[in-house]
Amino acid sequence: MAPRAYWKGSLKLSLVTCPVVLYPASTSVEKTRFHLINRETGNRLKQQMIDAETGDLVEGDQKGRGYELSKGQYVEIEPEELEAVQIESNHTIDIDSFVPREEIDQRYLNHPYYIAPDGKAAVDAFAVIRDAMKDQDRVALARIVLTHREHVIAIEPMGKGMLGTTLRFPYELRDEAEFFDDIKAPKITKDMVELAGHILQTKAAHFKPSEFKDQYETALKALVKRKASGKPIKLPEPEERSGNVVSLMDALKQSLGKGDKKAAPAPSRRAPAHRRPAKKAHRSAARQRKAG
């Protein structure tokens, strides 16, 4: 059975238009989920809305949406007023520009979607746009309306299809200066940096997501299985922290001595999903945030 499309519409480049479909590239179906239950009965609990001041139960027709102007002061927004500012989808992905891949700052990347042609008649136009981007190593920046909100989406070739990733707006990112300005000047030597470089070489590898292991998820499933079968659960003893103080140079030397993995050759080509933050674009965005 074909996966259900999240969005259907057209991809538009100037006068070239082709029908496309979007599918979410991520899923949380396999994640272990817990529900709140009554310990005495084992029944699932349901949540109710309670007035924070009076403690009274609030029914569905009494609930509204309010924006907090000041502490405890809200302006209520009616549903029809919200609808007035929502953007109706025109079911078109309008490509505004094509940018070099390396200029895209990773911090702006948000939700990924797979983009495929919708029907046989769309394949040729879809392939022309896809292959042109591949040849020039550029990423399309376009606009799309999802759930009544307009988003900027970055579109790039991926195999036979394309990958679209919605981008955050500058106001959604915090300025790194808030966190980095107080970092003091380091007292390190060239030898320390070279030793660290050798350690890096012993751990050099290729990017292989298939080797990622979610140890917490695995442990959760094992815990649930043991608990459901009535087996006792043994809690681990807390680890004692070592009180030994080791100098940075000694730690580097000891780490290098433990390195038993040979350095892997550097990848000949950067993977499409892995992008280096663009300093130029980032500085520009930071200036915009400060100016705002």
Swiss-Prot record:
InterPro entries according to UniProt: Ku70/Ku80_beta-barrel_dom, Prok_Ku, SPOC-like_C_dom_sf
Chain residue ranges for the region called Disordered: 231-292
GO annotation terms (biological process): DNA recombination; double-strand break repair via nonhomologous end joining
Keywords: DNA damage, DNA recombination, DNA repair, DNA-binding
Listed Basic residues bias regions: 271-292
Similarity section: Belongs to the prokaryotic Ku family.
Listed PANTHER family: NON-HOMOLOGOUS END JOINING PROTEIN KU
Annotated HAMAP family: Prokaryotic_Ku
Assembly, per entry: Homodimer. Interacts with LigD.
Protein name per its UniProtKB record: Non-homologous end joining protein Ku
Organism phylogeny: Bacteria, Pseudomonadati, Pseudomonadota, Alphaproteobacteria, Hyphomicrobiales
